[in-house]
């Protein structure tokens, strides 16, 4: 009921505030006009009344707003007090047990939780127990297993050549003296001397360039062999001629009237056969070359 009353009063105050503002504006406009003295006096009185009513309305409005603020702060305080009463735990740390939770206020019924962390070597089991008292109830929770695993201690490094104190998974051949079964089972201990590492340089493979060839069928016409007819060369048998010349001269006249030359060429072949005789004139005889062996006495 109180909330509804506050809302009604707030609405009425807003309405009166608006109406009074309008009245002040109207009265100021009328006062500026040149009216009679009685009207001006009445307008001034109305303006005074309106201004005082505005002041009163403002005071009432501020007071109602303060009441609302106080109500909200009271509600917030009640809520915080309830939260404080219901919050059960405060966080502290214990170096031996780990992390533990406990509550300082023991007036109301509360729940307290204690978390005990054991050492990592011992496995813990989840245990939850509830203890009821007159005012408090406590619960204890322990984790099941630790999350971290124990690391195994590595044995110290031993010298490479001292094999007397090492435990082998096989039988070394140094123990076997003359036992054949021992020699069949044993293994030789490798020498752990650091050897030089052979660094192999990568060899570059030769790059083979391949050129694409157009394999097209070659259409070549076969060349025609020139047909040559065998020409029969004439066999010329040249025989050295035996020239016999007779010159007829006319001694009486002294002028060469008639010259006749009879040339008889007797050609003999390699077989001893004679060729037919030839008779030349003097002009033909002089034009042919003569050899000294073939010229006979005229």
Curated annotation (Swiss-Prot):
Where is the site Cleavage? 65-66
A Pfam family: Glycoprotein_G
UniProt biased composition (Low complexity): 242-256
Listed GO CC annotations? extracellular region; host cell plasma membrane; membrane; virion membrane
Listed transmembrane segments: 38-66
* Keyword presence, Glycoprotein: yes
Which residue intervals are annotated with compositional bias (Basic and acidic residues) in the record?
A: 221-232
Chain ranges sitting on the Extracellular side read: 67-298
Polar residues biased stretches: 140-150, 266-298
Which cysteine pairs are covalently linked by disulfides here? 173-186, 176-182
Q: What's in the keyword line of the UniProt record?
A: Disulfide bond, Glycoprotein, Host cell membrane, Host membrane, Host-virus interaction, Membrane, Secreted, Transmembrane, Transmembrane helix, Viral attachment to host cell, Viral immunoevasion, Virion, Virus entry into host cell
Residue stretches of biased makeup (Basic residues): 192-215
Q: Which residues lie on this side of the membrane: Cytoplasmic?
A: 1-37
| Region described as Disordered: spans on this chain | 132-161, 192-298
* Residues covered by region (Binding to host heparan sulfate): 187-198
What is the name of the protein in this document? Major surface glycoprotein G
> From which lineage does this chain's organism come?
Viruses, Riboviria, Orthornavirae, Negarnaviricota, Haploviricotina
């Amino acid at each position: 009921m109180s909330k509804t009353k506050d809302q009604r009063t707030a609405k009425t105050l807003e309405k009166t505030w608006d109406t009074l503002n309008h009245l002040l504006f109207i009265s100021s406009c009328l006062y500026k006009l040149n009216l009679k003295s009685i009207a001006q006096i009445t307008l001034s009185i109305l303006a005074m009344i309106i201004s005082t009513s505005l002041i009163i309305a403002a005071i009432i409005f501020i007071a109602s707003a303060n009441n609302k603020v106080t109500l909200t702060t009271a509600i917030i305080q009640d809520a915080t007090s309830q939260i404080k009463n219901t919050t059960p735990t405060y966080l502290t740390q214990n170096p031996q047990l780990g992390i533990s939770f406990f509550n300082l206020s023991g007036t109301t019924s509360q729940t307290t939780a204690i978390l005990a962390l054991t050492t990592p070597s011992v496995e813990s089991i989840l245990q939850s127990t509830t203890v009821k008292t007159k005012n408090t109830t406590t619960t204890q929770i322990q984790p099941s297993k630790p999350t971290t695993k124990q690391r195994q201690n590595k044995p110290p490094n031993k010298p490479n050549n001292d094999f007397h104190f090492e435990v082998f998974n096989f039988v070394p051949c140094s123990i076997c003296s003359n036992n054949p079964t021992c020699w069949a089972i044993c293994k030789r201990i490798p020498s752990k001397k650091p050897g030089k590492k052979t660094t192999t340089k990568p060899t570059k493979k030769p790059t083979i360039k391949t050129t694409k060839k157009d394999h097209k069928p070659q259409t070549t016409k076969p060349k025609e062999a020139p047909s040559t007819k065998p020409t029969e060369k004439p066999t010329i048998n040249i025989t050295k001629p035996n020239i016999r010349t007779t010159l007829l001269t006319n001694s009486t006249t002294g002028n060469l009237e008639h010259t006749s030359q009879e040339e008889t060429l007797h050609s003999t072949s390699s077989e001893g056969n004679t060729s037919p005789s030839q008779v030349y004139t003097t002009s033909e005889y002089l034009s042919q070359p003569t050899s000294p062996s073939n010229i006979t006495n005229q």
